Amino acid sequence: MWGQPPSAVRSSAARPLLRPPPPPPLLPLLFYNAQVKIWDVIIVGGGIIGLSLSIALRKRGAAVLIVERGEPGREASHAAGGMLVDCLIETPLALQPLATASARLYPEFAHELEIESGMKVDLRDQGTILFLSPEHAARNSQLLVCNSLPIPLAQLEPALADHQLPVLYLKERSVDPRALTAAAWKTAKNRGVDFSSGDEVTTITITAGCATGVTTTKTAFRAPKVVNCAGAWSGQIGPTNVPTRPVKGQMLCLLMPSRTLLQHVVRAPEVYLIPRSDGRLLVGATVEEAGFDKRTDLATIQRLHRAALALVPKLADAKIHDDWAGLRPGTPDALPILGATETPGYYVATGHFRDGILLAPITAEVMTAVIEGRTPEFDLTAFSPARFE
């Protein structure tokens, strides 16, 4: 359905000029290109959601431009843990079909990115050990029966301390979000997606009631379709109310004394642990209403560190490698915002909160259908931007 890639606009004068035309004004190259180039779709935001969508659209032949306020993949995607959690205990009921479908897509999604980028994304399928609080256990007794440990906990993960909490074993995967996003960025570039980085969108351009592009702090870009994938910043642009807010999460990274010390993702009421294949161990994470503040604080990092040591005492020998904070895009009802808006040509794919990494493949799939005017495989009514009008 998409046309040819953007090309320069050529003059079609009716008669030859009597004298040479005056030279064009000395405009920045980026501005000049924006005047003579029209994309099929402009995506605002270069996190994993925007990158995945751009790849899906390019597969369908669309000419795509990603406009990113910083560097692609350096905000929430960079700070994420990468647990591919589709367990009903923690997933809102309305989101469960999308979460389950996206988790199933992940092996193919990750493999494709690895093949096309030549990079590894560290997709692991060792599973998750989940310690439940008494309250969660009482509400999910059936899950305790269906997801019991395959072998005693002391054999499954010997480094774990003894615990009295109910425990589940979940066949979940994990992925390295930084590696995943880097691979998606390279894949998008290899497929011909255009990028404008360090370029903050200030407004969506509206002409005759329809979206026709974006205006940035540097210039303007044109396209008949614009998708807001700006994460925690989504509410700051566009003609439609997009009530996202930043939800801060602090994490730290330990270097395990042995790469085999911990093999499974471990989730407990106070902390979660995510081992990487290279011996790193991510420890997270807080959920804080702190505006756009991305600073870490020592007391919080120390609290997370103590919680990790309580789960795995041998981590006392682990070195602290790094700590950071990221801003997840939260929404009033804890559900993503996916779909077309009341402004023709303007779409939204944001508000994934803690599930952006998990939901990237399915978001790309359903939003590509919506943008092309096809009916998506899943009912998106619960995620419609119109629910906030």
Model regions: which residues?
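Short hydrophobic core segments
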Residues: 42-44, 221-231, 364
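N-terminal Rossmann-like FAD-binding beta1-loop-alpha1 element of flavoenzymes
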Residues: 41-65
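Intrinsic, low-complexity polybasic segments
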Residues: 4-5
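Active-site substrate-recognition segment that forms the wall
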Residues: 55-60, 82-84, 119-124, 225, ...
